[in-house]
Curated annotation (Swiss-Prot):
The lineage of its organism: Bacteria, Pseudomonadati, Pseudomonadota, Gammaproteobacteria, Candidatus Palibaumannia. It comes from the Bacteria. Part of the 30S ribosomal subunit. Contacts proteins S9 and S11. One of its GO terms (cellular component) is small ribosomal subunit. Coiled coil: none annotated. One of its GO terms (molecular function) is tRNA binding. Belongs to the universal ribosomal protein uS7 family. PANTHER family: RIBOSOMAL PROTEIN S7 (PTHR11205). Keywords: Ribonucleoprotein, Ribosomal protein, RNA-binding, rRNA-binding, tRNA-binding. The gene is rpsG. InterPro entries: Ribosomal_uS7, Ribosomal_uS7_bac/org-type, Ribosomal_uS7_dom, Ribosomal_uS7_dom_sf. The keyword Acetylation does not apply. This is Small ribosomal subunit protein uS7. One of its GO terms (biological process) is translation.
Amino acid sequence: MPRRRLIGQRKILPDPKLGSERLAKFINILMKNGKKSLAETIVYSALEIIAKRSGKNYLEAFEAALDNVRPAIEVKSRRVGGSTYQVPVEVRSIRRDTLAMRWIVEAARKRSDKSMAIRLANELVDATEHKGAAVKKREEVHRMADANKAFAHYRW
């Protein structure tokens, strides 16, 4: 925590093609070594693949995938009297989006398809259908929170 004042969160400029701030955040998460134009190319081509396959709008498909991966609750470690408890905590809305995007990108990178655009498109399609590694990660986090429900009174 800063001593003087809280620093506000940086504003992310919307992406140039579709004007969506969430998509710009997704591109930034996908980006490696500052190569933003490459990340944009990958994301836009993945969205085109999804649009051809499903016939949906770009952003509708993207939002549907994010909705199915967003976690509602997670566990945080809390030390109480010499032992550490996994305390279930509700996830803030900004962190929900960030975690969902991060999990989708990680799952897409672990896939074994030809190009990153195809891997990302397949992971997004799987997420819209409640399948895939990103959705599995969300279910795992929810299961952990459910298993540690007894420690919810240690919330801070």
